[in-house]
């Protein structure tokens, strides 16, 4: 098969990004809570519009943050010496601030179906390659036709604002780069112009420098946003909240109704008396209509009595709306949203009271299963990132079989964890591996703890202190 030109790859990648832009924007709006508001008739006043804005709550954002907050890389294991783990952690992970930036591909993977991380060598710091999250809005990765899981080429686009020398007006210039397995090609386009080549060169990685985080990829390589199935449920909750706010604003109190009473004042002949201005002219309202004179029956009070003329006048109350019905429906919809998203309902509703450890673990079992699935997919993606980083550092990437060490994000008792670790050490379990089970432990921390333990074991002061404490206890 003839090689496909980089211009063809460029056009194909940009076309795919343009086609996916509407879906990307919709997913981003729902995640940020900026999606369409509940329906209201045309011409409603500001009070209705204010309630319409209040009705929207970012439930979908909570369903994304719940699993993402449990995804934390604490280190890497390799088949080589332990110092390789430390080098990867310091020169790749911490050097690129991935401790905080790692959540970006996780969020993009859940919201848009794919997160993207790029790897590139640094000219001045060869042993510390650049690893950076990318937006799936601007990066497209093409795969082999017979292997939808191995990248074949990629396209990245971005924009810059430029100003010609001596000019005040700025212009937006588009840039793009095409990566193949062997080369890269840079392009540039000014407003109203065509894509023109800028530069090209060899792809030193020998691979596409983009790694995708795809939690819902199928056998055809298709990706699916994990929040898109929640859109109808989000709109239903917003609509019920809008109805609740309307009922609370306009019918959440008892209303008095008077029948058989005409407040319009009339003269002896039965003619309507009209309000007049000080100059004797008729008083007109904003629409230009004259206003009648109304009788005031008085203001109600504890020590007051209202009297209405007319034998047929009746006064009674209308009951207030029962807002608990709205609350019940909203709670049901939120529970369904939680079930679909595999997020415990107590995360969204706050209904927790006196739960034991076993009951809490059972309540969070669905979320724990979701997080474990995400760790498998995202862990494989990070392993590929580390391999590319090794190549960018001058290695081959083939001998670095890394394994991601995930932090334990489940709710557990620290005392129980320590008790279990102590028992493992007592039966001969390696201390380094046991220390790695402590919540928040990283490769650097474990190395530091091991060194401290060795220093204390070699210190006569510590030995004498332990003997003294033992004698006092005896």
Where are these regions (language model features)?
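Extended, helix-rich architectural segments
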Residues: 1-134, 138-140, 144, 148-149, ...
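Extended, regular secondary-structure scaffolds
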Residues: 111, 116-224
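Extended, charged amphipathic alpha-helical segments
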Residues: 198-362, 404, 409, 413-415
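Generic recognition of stable, solvent-exposed alpha-helical segments in well-folded globular domains
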Residues: 232-235, 325-332, 336, 366-369, ...
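C-terminal structural cap/anchor segments
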Residues: 336, 340-400
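Extended amphipathic alpha-helical segments with heptad-repeat/coiled-coil character used for oligomerization
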Residues: 393-427
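Membrane-proximal bilayer-interacting regions
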Residues: 411, 418-448
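Long, highly charged low-complexity segments enriched in Glu/Asp and Lys/Arg with interspersed Ser/Thr
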Residues: 438-468
């Amino acid at each position: 098969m003839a090689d496909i030109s980089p211009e063809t790859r460029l056009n194909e990648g940009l076309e795919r990004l343009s086609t996916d832009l509407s879906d990307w924007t919709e997913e981003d709006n729902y995640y940020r809570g900026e999606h369409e508001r509940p329906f209201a008739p045309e011409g409603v006043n500001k009070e209705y519009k204010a309630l319409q804005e209040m009705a929207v709550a970012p439930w979908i954002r909570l369903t994304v943050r719940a699993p993402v907050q449990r995804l934390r890389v604490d280190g890497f294991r390799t088949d080589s010496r332990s110092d390789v783990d430390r080098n990867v952690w310091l020169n790749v992970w911490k050097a690129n601030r991935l401790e905080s930036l790692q959540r970006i591909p996780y969020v993009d993977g859940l919201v848009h179906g794919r997160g993207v991380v790029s790897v590139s060598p640094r000219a001045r710091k060869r042993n510390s390659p650049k690893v950076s999250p990318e937006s799936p809005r601007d990066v497209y990765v093409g795969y082999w036709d017979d292997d939808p899981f191995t990248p074949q080429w990629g396209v990245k686009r971005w924009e810059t604002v430029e100003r010609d020398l001596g000019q005040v007006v700025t212009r937006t210039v588009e840039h793009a780069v095409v990566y193949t397995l062997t080369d890269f090609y840079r392009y540039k386009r000014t407003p109203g112009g065509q894509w023109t080549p800028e530069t090209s060169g060899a792809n030193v990685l020998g691979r596409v420098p983009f790694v995708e985080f795809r939690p819902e990829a199928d056998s055809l390589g298709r990706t699916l946003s994990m929040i898109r199935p929640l859109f109808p449920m989000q709109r239903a909750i917003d609509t019920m909240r809008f109805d609740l706010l309307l009922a609370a604003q306009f019918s959440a109190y008892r209303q008095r109704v008077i029948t058989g009473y005409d407040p319009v004042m009339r003269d002896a002949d039965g003619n309507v008396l009209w309000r007049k201005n000080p100059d004797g002219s008729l008083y007109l309202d904003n629409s230009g209509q004259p206003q009648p004179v109304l009788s005031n029956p008085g203001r109600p009070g504890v020590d007051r009595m209202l009297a209405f003329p007319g034998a047929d006048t009746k006064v009674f109350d209308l009951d207030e709306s029962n807002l608990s019905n709205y609350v019940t429906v909203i709670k049901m919809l939120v529970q369904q949203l939680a079930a679909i998203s595999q997020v415990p309902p107590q995360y969204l509703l706050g209904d927790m009271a006196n739960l034991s450890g076993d009951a809490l673990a059972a309540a969070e079992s669905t979320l724990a299963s979701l997080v474990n699935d995400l760790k498998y997919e995202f862990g494989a993606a990070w392993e590929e990132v580390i391999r590319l980083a090794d190549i960018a550092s001058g290695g081959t990437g083939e001998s670095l079989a890394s394994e991601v060490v995930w932090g334990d994000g489940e709710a557990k008792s620290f005392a129980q964890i320590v008790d279990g670790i102590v028992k493992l050490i007592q039966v001969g379990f390696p201390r380094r591996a046991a220390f790695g089970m402590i919540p928040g432990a990283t490769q650097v921390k474990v190395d530091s703890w091991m060194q401290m333990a060795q220093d204390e074991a070699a210190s006569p002061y510590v030995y004498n202190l332990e003997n003294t404490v033992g004698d006092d206890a005896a």
